[in-house]
Amino acid sequence: MSTIRPVFYVSDGTGITAETIGHSLLTQFSGFNFVTDRMSFIDDADKARDAAMRVRAAGERYQVRPVVVNSCVDPQLSMILAESGALMLDVFAPFIEPLERELNAPRHSRVGRAHGMVDFETYHRRINAMNFALSHDDGIALNYDEADVILVAVSRAGKTPTCIYLALHYGIRAANYPLTDEDLENEQLPPRLRNYRSKLFGLTIDPERLQQIRQERRANSRYSAAETCRREVAIAERMFQMERIPSLSTTNTSIEEISSKVLSTLGLQREMF
């Protein structure tokens, strides 16, 4: 049996919901080469027919049944997509009927409705959080009074992408502080962070993985040397333990999981956008 399987994330909006759920499902299966494609703004019958043709063509090309993760809210669009012969995984369908029964009200299948529930205030909060993350990246700005969280780690341990994810998806003002050679030499919490203990969260990483990442950026240097990576990670982990800073290894952990752990550990209650 072929290990290649085409997967399409189809939506009448951006496709982020379908792709996020689909990715979470696919990660449960190893040994497959999932060829993914996102088809966004499929919001009328003509676009749905074109999408179905693309899905069908992929099935013929790979000689295997495609998978469609579908978040279109209009049942008619879903029916057209199903004509492709793909395995249809509808994001909303399993929940709509029980909700209709519970609420004693029919749903309104308005295209794009599920993607238009974010008000201006929420949008403004997200943009402000993103600007904050960028201006407080890698220790650029050290005024952390307005920060919701400060990620602390050695260089290239995953601080920046986690901060950006927290900003975009939760509106969290996330700053990050890179542990410098001086910080690591002292093996103590840097003075500029001591007034913000309740906001600190440490990220650690397997030294071998850290070396791989650093080699891509600065190959064959002291910065990317195996001994340097082992030393920095060991000191950072001792510091987190000594200073009682909660921490998490990013080695085999997704950004989504890291972000969720940060929020729950620091007691930050925010709904996902």
From Swiss-Prot:
Molecular function in Gene Ontology: ADP binding; ATP binding; phosphotransferase activity, phosphate group as acceptor; protein serine/threonine kinase activity
One Pfam family per UniProt: Kinase-PPPase
Catalytic reaction annotation: [pyruvate, water dikinase] + ADP = [pyruvate, water dikinase]-phosphate + AMP + H(+); [pyruvate, water dikinase]-phosphate + phosphate + H(+) = [pyruvate, water dikinase] + diphosphate
Signal sequence extent: none
Catalytic activity, EC: 2.7.11.33, 2.7.4.28
Chain residues that bind ADP: 153-160
Superkingdom of the organism of origin: Bacteria
Protein keywords: Kinase, Nucleotide-binding, Serine/threonine-protein kinase, Transferase
Family: Belongs to the pyruvate, phosphate/water dikinase regulatory protein family. PSRP subfamily.
Function summary: Bifunctional serine/threonine kinase and phosphorylase involved in the regulation of the phosphoenolpyruvate synthase (PEPS) by catalyzing its phosphorylation/dephosphorylation.
Protein name: Putative phosphoenolpyruvate synthase regulatory protein
Organism for this UniProt entry: Xanthomonas euvesicatoria pv. vesicatoria (strain 85-10)
Species lineage: Bacteria, Pseudomonadati, Pseudomonadota, Gammaproteobacteria, Lysobacterales
